[in-house]
Structures are given as C-alpha cells and as structure tokens.
C-alpha cells in the first residue's frame, strides 16, 4: 500500500486550466444554482473538462443517502426537498453553455418514495426539449433494483444509461454502501437492455482499491455478459483520509493492457487510464460507438 504522505507518480499530475472557459462554466453553474459531481466528488478531471466546456450535472440535491467508502459526496439519512424547477434550470444552463453532450448524474435518494426516478426523468426530458440536438447521458443510481422506476428513466429517452459497479465483486461489500450490491448493479444494467434493447449502456471500475488482476478481468466478463456496451477503467484517488485507502497506483501500461483485453471481449468502447471516469470525454465515447456501428 502506498505511503499516503509520499508524492504521487508523475502520471497523476493534474494540469490547470489554460483558458477562460473554466471560469465561464463555473459562473453558469452558480447562476443557475446547480450541483456538479465534478465539485462534489472532487473529480481530478474538473479543470480539464470545464476548460473544455464539459461537465456532469448532479441532480436530486447534494446529500446522498448512501455512504460508499470511496466517495466524498456529502451523505446523510435524508436529502433536501426536491426542487421542481431544477429540470428547467439544468436545461437552461446546458443551453447557455451550448452543450452538445449533456451528462447527468445524481445522489441516491432512498428517502423518497420513488427514489428520485421521476425527478431524474424530468431532468432528461427538459434537456431534450430545450436542446433537441443534444445527446444526454444518464449516470443512474440503482433505484433499489425496481424495474418500474428504471423504466421511467429509460422512457425519458437518454442516449446512454450508465450505472457503475465501481469495484470487483469481493471488495463491493466493504467499499460500497451496504444497500448497494455488485450483482444488483449487474441486474440494473441487464434490465436497461430488457426495457430497451437498443439503449447504449456503460459501467465503470475504479482500480487501486485492493483488487487482483484476475478479479478485474472477471468483472469485465460479468459486464460483457450483462450486455454492457461501454466500459471505463480509472485510478482510484483517495479524496481524504476519511475514505478508503489507495492500495496501489496502476501504471499507464497496465491500463492499456486492460483496455485491449476489454476490447477482445467485444465491448463497443473501452476507455482506460489513470484519470478516466464514467463521464470523462463521454461525448467522444458516444461518437466513436455510433461511428463504428454505422461502419459495421
């Protein structure tokens, strides 16, 4: 396990923004009183993405009812009252930023009767209405595995639905909240395809939490069997000493090997690298998949 006081490897250095775009994105988020997972989860790509005019909106408030040990998002037994104007504000912000690819994620809301599914679907529809030419990716919670709630989000017609297994099967009970589950997450991904066989699906793994190489490959096989189209693999970076410790730093070469292995399994797209996250360059992932499907 790396010494937490030691410098990180050179490949984990984050570049600072170079243009005024970062500030412009920040101003729009503040103007419309919105949350982003980029800030709430201390994403290492925030500078690069905002500098490029990309961001991931976080809906349903900023308090998660689950407490995964790797995550720095504020958590508690209940979140804030739902803001019925949030879908329209989100869509207005996306329009002002002239986004062609809009990524939406959320906290878990186990305190709500529908776990936030209706509000989430309303956010997707609002973006589709105000930006009919934009693509929308929804990074969803598990909605406790309820198919009727998942259907609400699928029926809002996002272009991609992502749901993350986060880590390998062995570590899932230790790293994720007890209400989450490795196999439940796989079932959610399968259920998306049951509701709409043509929906693109995506999932993500964070590496360096203590997993073995064979376990990563087993997880990739599980995702392939769940008919997932896009997989992302990234380095887990401990937000603070309160979160799960980093067990190792995965070298860029190993990420490249895992990406090649994933492609050999038949995924339509595999993104792997130290800073790769579910929404990292998500628009590029989508364009690549669509382009490849048209050439097939």
Swiss-Prot record:
Coiled-coil positions: none
Cofactor note: Binds 2 [4Fe-4S] clusters per subunit. One cluster is coordinated with 3 cysteines and an exchangeable S-adenosyl-L-methionine.
SMART domains noted in UniProt: Elp3
Pathway given in the UniProt record: Protein modification; protein lipoylation via endogenous pathway; protein N(6)-(lipoyl)lysine from octanoyl-[acyl-carrier-protein]: step 2/2
GO CC terms of this entry: cytoplasm
Main enzyme class: transferase
EC number: 2.8.1.8
Primary location: cytoplasm
Catalyzed reaction equations: [[Fe-S] cluster scaffold protein carrying a second [4Fe-4S](2+) cluster] + N(6)-octanoyl-L-lysyl-[protein] + 2 oxidized [2Fe-2S]-[ferredoxin] + 2 S-adenosyl-L-methionine + 4 H(+) = [[Fe-S] cluster scaffold protein] + N(6)-[(R)-dihydrolipoyl]-L-lysyl-[protein] + 4 Fe(3+) + 2 hydrogen sulfide + 2 5'-deoxyadenosine + 2 L-methionine + 2 reduced [2Fe-2S]-[ferredoxin]
MF terms in GO: 4 iron, 4 sulfur cluster binding; lipoate synthase activity; metal ion binding
Domain Radical SAM core: 50-268
Residues that bind [4Fe-4S] cluster 2: 64, 68, 71
CDD domains: Radical_SAM (cd01335)
Required cofactor(s): [4Fe-4S] cluster
Cross-referenced Gene3D superfamilies: Aldolase class I
Residues at which [4Fe-4S] cluster 1 binds: 38, 43, 49, 279
Keywords: 4Fe-4S, Cytoplasm, Iron, Iron-sulfur, Metal-binding, S-adenosyl-L-methionine, Transferase
Cellular localization per UniProt: Cytoplasm
Listed NCBIfam families: lipA, PRK05481.1, PRK12928.1
Family according to the record: Belongs to the radical SAM superfamily. Lipoyl synthase family.
Protein name: Lipoyl synthase
């Amino acid at each position: 396990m790396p010494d937490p006081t030691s410098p990180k490897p050179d490949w984990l250095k984050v570049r600072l923004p170079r243009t005024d775009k970062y500030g412009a994105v920040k101003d729009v988020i503040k103007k419309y009183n919105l949350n982003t997972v980029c800030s709430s989860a201390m994403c290492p790509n925030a500078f690069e993405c905002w500098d490029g005019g990309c961001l991931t909106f976080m809906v349903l408030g900023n308090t998660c009812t689950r407490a995964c040990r790797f995550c720095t998002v504020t958590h508690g037994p209940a979140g804030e009252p739902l803001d019925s104007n949030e879908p329209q504000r989100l869509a207005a912000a996306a329009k002002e930023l002239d986004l062609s690819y809009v990524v939406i994620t959320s906290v878990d809301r186990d305190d709500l009767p529908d776990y936030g599914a209706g509000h989430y679907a309303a956010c997707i529809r609002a973006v589709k209405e105000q930006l009919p030419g934009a693509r929308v990716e929804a990074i969803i919670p598990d909605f406790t595995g309820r198919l009727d709630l998942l259907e609400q989000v699928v029926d809002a017609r996002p272009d991609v639905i992502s749901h993350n297994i986060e880590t390998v099967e062995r570590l899932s009970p230790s790293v994720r909240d007890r209400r989450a589950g490795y196999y439940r997450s796989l079932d959610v991904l399968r259920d998306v395809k049951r509701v709409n066989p043509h929906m693109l699906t995506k999932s993500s793994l964070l590496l360096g939490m203590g997993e073995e190489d064979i376990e990563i490959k087993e997880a990739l096989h599980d995702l392939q069997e769940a008919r997932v189209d896009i997989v992302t693999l990234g380095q887990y970076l401990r937000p603070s000493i309160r979160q799960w410790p980093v067990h190792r730093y995965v070298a860029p070469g190993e990420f490249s090997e895992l990406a090649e292995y994933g492609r050999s399994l038949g995924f339509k797209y595999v993104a792997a690298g130290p800073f790769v996250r579910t929404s990292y360059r998500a628009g590029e992932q989508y364009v690549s998949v669509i382009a490849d499907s048209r050439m097939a």
